[in-house]
Amino acid sequence: MRIHFLLFALLFLFLMPVPGNGGIINMLQKSYCKIRKGRCALLGCLPKEEQIGSCSVSGRKCCRKKK
């Protein structure tokens, strides 16, 4: 039973974001953006695009063409 607590603690530490680097969180957000037919923009969306989310903790935006 104690091994469950140890595994849970290790999983929790693995998923915690490191300051300055989102790691797995950034990867998940980027994948979610691609699934929604978007692209990750560094500064902002183009005039014919709308923001549908974010791609990283650092502020990259997920954009796609307006419908």
From Swiss-Prot:
Keywords assigned by UniProt, alphabetized: Antibiotic, Antimicrobial, Defensin, Disulfide bond, Secreted, Signal
Cellular component, GO, one term: extracellular space
GO molecular function, one term: CCR6 chemokine receptor binding
GO biological process terms, semicolon-separated: cell chemotaxis; defense response to bacterium
Keyword Transmembrane helix: no
InterPro entries: Defensin_beta-like
Segments passing through the bilayer: none
UniProt main location, coarse: secreted
Location(s) in or outside the cell: Secreted
Function according to Swiss-Prot or TrEMBL: Exhibits antimicrobial activity against Gram-positive and Gram-negative bacteria.
Family indicated by similarity: Belongs to the beta-defensin family.
Name of the protein in question: Beta-defensin 103A
Upper taxonomic lineage: Eukaryota, Metazoa, Chordata, Craniata, Vertebrata
